[in-house]
Amino acid sequence: RHEMVQIIADEVKKANVGVDIRIYPAKSLYKPKEQWKPMTTGQLDISAFPLAYASKFHPEFDATLMPGTVKNHDHALRFNKGPMMTEIKKIINDAGVVVLSDAWLGGGFASKTKCIKNPSDAKGQVMRAAGKAFNQMLEAAGAGIQSMPSSEIYTGLQTLSLIHI
């Protein structure tokens, strides 16, 4: 996300429009999940913000983080113009936030022991996922949930306290 905002800052600087974008790395200004409110009140101007981070205010935002939502770039372009994202963007705009760019990351599952292709493959596995709805989906499939910040995933996989992400 840092690199994405850096590209925006570099392009704005090249455009010479009198706007200076300063990036605050490593959660030094706001923690990632605390950025929604400052964006809605004008205290934070730009953020590369996963919408699911604001799901405690707008639960429907969690749907944007579900696996398989977007399959590739072409699908992302179509999806962004579809009814779900139209409604999501209305909520964003009504909160006073403007989307500068849409970004979708292809995601999936990683495992040290088996291939996770279907919900039934999660049964009995200890997994870590991002977002409340994602965790609920995995629990419904029979997985055990290991909560940990993304910064601790690598260590969790090394120590086997986490087998799947």
Give the positions of each predicted feature.
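Short, hydrophobic alpha-helical packing/hinge segments within bilobed ligand-binding/sensory domains
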Residues: 32-36, 153-156
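Flexible glycine/serine/alanine-rich "lid" or loop that lines and gates the nucleotide-sugar donor pocket
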Residues: 159
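An acidic- and aromatic-residue-enriched active-site/binding cleft used to recognize and process polar
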Residues: 26, 150-151
